[in-house]
């Protein structure tokens, strides 16, 4: 009989804010908020330390709301590169316990410690050791969810380890019926707000209710996604802890929320679509791939009454040429846009293949067009993202300069 796996989900408490407090001792006893743009009160709270959360501050809320609840809070601009560096330091610590470490996000990592127990002790002993190492060396408090698979480890961390005194909780096939099944279905790993709403309308309010729901009905309604939801609710997850989670990438995309409502295509929207197309194609070229399916997404400015679309088109041949992708994006957008103000745009390139060879085209100098993109990439990689830039990005609608100062949409 195969030995049951032991999987950890290690999560850093209020990661961005905790890093700032660890590196600035004078902030130790003060509430700290990390916000995307502290100069703009409409900015979003990216992280709030426990002292700020005690005053009612929550992540993803507007900064002005957070400051009303906690006016004494110290508001800091994020340092994304520093957080990435610290995250890598934490990964290095975890890799001393096992070589099976999978970053799930910048502040969460899965570990498979099944084969590590003879060296480092019981799962509880290993979890406590990891907590101590990270606190001593990084100054950040880690919580650990333990389970026989990734799904249960994640649920154990999110719903129990984050709330109990020692920051460690084990969820098993034996105790999940008493511990996990009574939880609201919205607290289950993989269930977002929209899915929660759909499940509630079907009479499913708890994880246990989802576990007991007829599988065939879930599959009929949501296909494979319905099957995965049912499996998770029943504590089933066969996905391994993978050290190469980026292998086999299916698509390359980029999106952004605009700083204001964009209403005019020629003066505003097309500038951002061109910038997004260029970013996607640059990343594709750096990855050595081309794509044959182009998609564009748009979200309207009214968040109370969501509008928008997500449409795609298959090209005649794979490409990573900015102009090819932009032309497809432009046609798609103009076909499906309802003319209303836009607040978010996205461009995606999928059905990827290697760029080693490409279909010869008798009517275009394809090699010349593709080489141009690689030359521009070389200049940017050597001298910076803004070393060479399109004239359209210099207009009021352009976002290229602003994005160049950020990582993942936030300041470096």
From Swiss-Prot:
SUPFAM superfamilies: DNA/RNA polymerases, Lesion bypass DNA polymerase (Y-family), little finger domain. One of its GO terms (molecular function) is damaged DNA binding. Residues 7-192 form the UmuC domain. Gene3D superfamilies: 3.30.70.270, 3.40.1170.60, 5' to 3' exonuclease, C-terminal subdomain, DNA polymerase, Y-family, little finger domain. Keywords: Cytoplasm, DNA damage, DNA repair, DNA replication, DNA-binding, DNA-directed DNA polymerase, Magnesium, Metal-binding, Mutator protein, Nucleotidyltransferase, Transferase. Mg(2+) binds at residues 11, 107. Binds 2 magnesium ions per subunit. One of its GO terms (biological process) is DNA-templated DNA replication. The record marks 16 as: Substrate discrimination. Disruption phenotype: No visible phenotype in the absence of DNA damage; in the presence of H(2)O(2) or methyl methanesulfonate (MMS) cells grow poorly on solid medium. A double polY2-rarA deletion is less sensitive to both H(2)O(2) and MMS. Its cofactor is Mg(2+). GO terms for cellular component: cytoplasm. Pfam families: IMS, IMS_C, IMS_HHH_1. PROSITE patterns: UMUC. InterPro entries: DNA/RNA_pol_sf, DNA_pol_Y-fam_lit_finger_sf, DNA_pol_Y-fam_little_finger, DNA_polymerase-Y, DNApol_IV, IMS_HHH_1, Rev_trsase/Diguanyl_cyclase, UmuC. The keyword RNA-binding does not apply. Its EC number is 2.7.7.7. It catalyses: DNA(n) + a 2'-deoxyribonucleoside 5'-triphosphate = DNA(n+1) + diphosphate. NCBIfam families: PRK03103.1 (NF002848). Poorly processive, error-prone DNA polymerase involved in untargeted mutagenesis. Copies undamaged DNA at stalled replication forks, which arise in vivo from mismatched or misaligned primer ends. These misaligned primers can be extended by PolIV. Exhibits no 3'-5' exonuclease (proofreading) activity. May be involved in translesion synthesis (TSL), in conjunction with the beta clamp from PolIII. Monomer. This is DNA polymerase IV 2. It comes from Bacillus subtilis (strain 168).
């Amino acid at each position: 009989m195969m030995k049951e796996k032991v999987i950890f989900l290690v999560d850093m408490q209020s990661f961005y804010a905790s890093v700032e407090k660890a590196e600035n001792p004078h902030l130790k006893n003060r509430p700290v908020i990390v916000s995307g743009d502290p100069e703009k009160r409409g900015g979003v709270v990216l992280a709030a330390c426990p002292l700020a959360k005690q005053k009612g501050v929550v992540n993803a809320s507007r900064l002005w709301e957070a400051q009303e609840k906690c006016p004494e809070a110290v508001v800091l601009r994020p340092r994304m590169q520093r957080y990435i560096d610290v995250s890598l330091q934490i990964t290095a610590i975890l890799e001393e316990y096992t070589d099976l470490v999978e970053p799930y996000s910048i502040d969460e990592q899965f570990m498979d410690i099944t084969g590590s127990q003879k060296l480092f002790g019981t799962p509880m002993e290993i979890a406590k050791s990891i907590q101590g190492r990270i606190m001593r060396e990084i100054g950040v408090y880690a919580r650990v969810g333990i389970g026989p698979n990734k799904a249960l480890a994640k649920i154990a961390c999110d719903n129990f380890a984050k709330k109990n005194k020692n920051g460690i909780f084990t969820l098993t096939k034996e105790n999940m019926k008493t511990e996990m099944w009574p939880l609201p279905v919205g607290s289950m790993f993989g269930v977002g707000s929209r899915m929660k709403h759909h499940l509630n309308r079907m009479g499913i309010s708890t994880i246990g209710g989802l576990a007991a729901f007829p599988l065939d009905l879930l599959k009929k309604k949501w296909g494979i996604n319905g099957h995965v939801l049912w499996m998770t609710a029943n504590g089933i997850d066969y996905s391994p802890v993978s050290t190469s989670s980026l292998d086999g990438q299916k698509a390359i995309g980029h999106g952004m929320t605009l700083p204001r409502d964009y209403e005019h295509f020629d003066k505003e929207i097309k500038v951002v679509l061109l910038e997004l197309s260029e970013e996607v194609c640059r990343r594709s070229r750096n990855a050595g791939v081309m794509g044959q399916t182009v998609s564009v997404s748009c979200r309207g400015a009214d968040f109370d009454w969501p509008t928008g679309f997500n449409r795609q088109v298959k090209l005649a041949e794979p490409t990573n040429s900015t102009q090819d992708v932009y032309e497809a994006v432009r046609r798609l957008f103009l076909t499906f846009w309802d003319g209303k103000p836009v607040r978010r745009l996205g461009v995606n390139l999928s059905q990827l293949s290697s760029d080693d060879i490409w279909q010869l085209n008798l009517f275009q100098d394809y090699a010349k067009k593709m080489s141009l993109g690689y030359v521009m990439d070389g200049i940017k990689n050597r001298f910076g993202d803004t070393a060479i830039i399109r004239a359209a990005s210099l207009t009021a609608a352009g976002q290229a300069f602003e994005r160049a100062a950020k990582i993942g949409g936030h300041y470096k």
